[in-house]
């Protein structure tokens, strides 16, 4: 049903409703009790798919209507961004999703969608969302793919602000929270 709704605004709200309805029924266990039950990987797949579809609809909104309505459309998109970001919040709330799961499935799925959407407004907002909703430990262990994705963003994206947000988020960590002490030393003494 959700894929059948082609109007971007209606589709976004329908997918947000779907996400809200499934919030308490998505599985949050690493291993299912039997082979017919679902586990956290199914939940991750569901939310990532919903995120990708919502983001496509959100990006498509910029092309709806006459060019004279561009300012109004951008304002609408700005107001709707939180609905798209809710998918990332939901992914971050999955307690069974480990660092390994984040590195292998969650972050690559998100970054692929962010980079491929080729929309500066979406890219900047979603990169900020990633920084804000996922734990510091996850960011420390995935700096390389995150920064590589920053290099692939559209020219209209303020990458400097994204990097500053990430630095501010990680700056407050204590040295024992960094697995590699040399990495902490380089970070704090290279300024």
Q: Would you name each region that the model predicts?
A:
Residues 1-191:
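Long amphipathic alpha-helical scaffold regions
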């Amino acid at each position: 049903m959700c894929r059948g709704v082609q109007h971007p605004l209606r589709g976004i709200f329908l997918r947000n409703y779907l996400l809200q309805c499934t919030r308490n029924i998505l599985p949050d266990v690493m291993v299912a009790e039997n082979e017919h039950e679902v586990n956290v990987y199914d939940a991750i797949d569901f939310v990532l798919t919903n995120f990708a579809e919502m983001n496509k609809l959100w990006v498509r909104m910029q092309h709806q209507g006459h060019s004279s309505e561009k300012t109004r459309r951008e304002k609408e998109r700005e107001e709707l961004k939180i609905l798209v970001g809710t998918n990332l919040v939901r992914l971050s709330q999955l307690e069974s999703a480990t660092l390994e799961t984040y590195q292998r499935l969650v972050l690559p799925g998100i970054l692929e969608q962010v980079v491929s959407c080729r929309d500066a407004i979406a890219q900047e907002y979603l990169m900020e969302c990633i920084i804000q909703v996922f734990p510091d430990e996850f960011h420390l262990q995935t700096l390389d793919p995150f920064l590589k994705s920053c290099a692939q963003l559209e020219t209209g994206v303020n990458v400097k602000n994204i990097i500053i947000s990430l630095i501010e988020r990680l700056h407050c960590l204590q040295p024992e929270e960094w697995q590699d002490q040399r990495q902490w030393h380089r970070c704090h003494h290279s300024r």
